[in-house]
């Protein structure tokens, strides 16, 4: 029988008992040993002390406090996989299912024993069979330096000269959604999804916009596969751009179509996501834009461990229109890397390239008043870079602010459609 006096006199023995108790989530053992360990450690930011207090807080049903401590611990040391597992379970108990599932998916990439994998799978199944409503929302601060995508002032060719100036706009974008799953039979379910988004600029309101999409369909999901079939309707509104600072919204377009998604875990580290969308777009005033839209997107995700992932993707977008000058095909590729660093720092880096080819020219061949590039179908080379930075230790009400630098460059066969711009965005989002 080991006494408290022996543990106080022998810190090595105390650690040999305390660390396994933390890993096993042995609530009684942690409760007995934590008070002894606290007497030896005067540093409140000691990792083992934080871990022990997180376990005790969860035992006392103080889930918000427990989650906060676990997040702090995993932020300091992302390699503590058993602390991450306990964080995921606490998130599940606090009904933060999306955040919990994200942590469980990261843990699957680690070299864990079969018993732990079984625990992860059981919690993942419970989340997949939830019938509760889920909600999400986000807001992003915007400070656009070239919202009208203007070319550089003074670009000229064939006696034509660019006179438009880049317009700035400050405001925010917003998004909100609600989703309800209803289990039908075993892994089959029906799904109802509402999603709305928009942009609001307080100093250049003619660029404001609102859109909403409603999806009703069904799906199948197990531990490795998910299939969704979701017919939808979508509406969008914007102000009259010919009226400066107009704040009255008018119906701009509507679409009816179908989404299909297939998500498949190839193994514990590789996941492939394929989405296909078919729709018919109709415009309220600009009827020349009416037409079908087809898009295909495929993304391959590799989670190397619980604090690092890589991804790549290819996309194809086909837009039909009555006016061939507005119909185009767009092929794109993208790749990126996400990393959780020590001390709570996280980063995400993405680069992309796209080729856009229009089906028709803007002007007729016999029009001698315009440059030659207006008489040929436009072709664009489109480049993008996104870098996102955030600190997992800095959050409030479950929201972690993220800052993104975005760079976009368009090289077009039509010189007046070539431009580049870079912006910073500040994002706040939450699932609940």
Task: For the regions a language model picked out, list residue spans one by one.
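Gram-negative and organellar
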Residues: 1-2, 19-24, 28-31, 42, ...
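TPR-adjacent "capping" and linker segments in tetratricopeptide-repeat scaffold/adaptor proteins
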Residues: 1-12, 37-47
């Amino acid at each position: 029988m080991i006494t408290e006096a022996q543990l106080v006199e022998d810190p090595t023995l105390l650690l040999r008992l305390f660390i396994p108790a933390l890993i096993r989530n042995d609530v009684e053992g942690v409760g007995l040993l934590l008070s002894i360990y606290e007497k030896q450690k005067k540093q409140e930011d000691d990792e083992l002390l934080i871990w022990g207090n997180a376990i005790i807080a969860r035992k006392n049903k103080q889930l918000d406090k427990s989650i906060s401590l676990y997040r702090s611990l995993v932020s300091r040391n992302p390699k503590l996989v058993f602390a991450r597992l306990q964080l995921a379970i606490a998130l599940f108990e606090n009904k933060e299912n999306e955040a919990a599932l994200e942590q469980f998916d990261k843990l699957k990439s680690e070299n864990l024993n079969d018993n732990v994998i079984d625990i992860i799978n059981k919690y993942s199944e419970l989340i997949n069979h939830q019938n509760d409503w889920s909600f999400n929302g986000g807001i992003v601060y915007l400070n656009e330096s070239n919202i009208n995508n203007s070319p550089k002032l003074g670009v000229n060719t064939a006696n034509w000269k660019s006179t438009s100036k880049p317009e700035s706009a400050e405001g925010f974008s917003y998004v909100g959604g609600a989703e309800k799953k209803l289990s039908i039979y075993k892994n089959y379910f029906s799904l109802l999804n509402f999603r709305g988004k928009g942009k609001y600029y307080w100093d250049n309101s003619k660029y404001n916009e609102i859109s909403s999409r409603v999806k009703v369909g069904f799906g199948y999901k197990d531990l490795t596969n998910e299939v969704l079939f979701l017919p939808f309707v979508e509406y969008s509104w914007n102000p009259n751009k010919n009226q400066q600072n107009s704040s009255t919204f008018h119906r701009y377009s509507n679409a009816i179509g179908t989404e299909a998604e297939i998500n498949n875990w190839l193994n514990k580290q590789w996941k492939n996501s394929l989405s296909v969308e078919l729709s018919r777009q109709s415009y309220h005033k600009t009827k020349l834009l009416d037409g079908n839209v087809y898009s295909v997107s495929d993304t391959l995700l590799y989670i190397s461990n619980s604090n690092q992932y890589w991804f790549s993707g290819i996309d194809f977008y086909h837009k039909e229109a009555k006016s061939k000058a507005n119909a185009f095909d767009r092929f794109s590729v993208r790749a990126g890397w996400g990393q959780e660093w020590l001390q709570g720092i996280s980063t995400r880096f993405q680069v992309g390239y796209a080729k856009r080819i229009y089906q028709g020219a803007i002007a007729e061949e016999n029009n001698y008043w315009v440059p030659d590039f207006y008489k040929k179908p436009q072709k664009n080379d489109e480049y993008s870079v996104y870098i996102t930075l955030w600190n997992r230790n800095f959050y409030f009400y479950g929201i972690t602010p993220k800052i993104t630098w975005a760079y976009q460059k368009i090289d077009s066969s039509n010189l007046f459609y070539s431009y580049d711009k870079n912006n910073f965005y500040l994002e706040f989002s939450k699932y609940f």
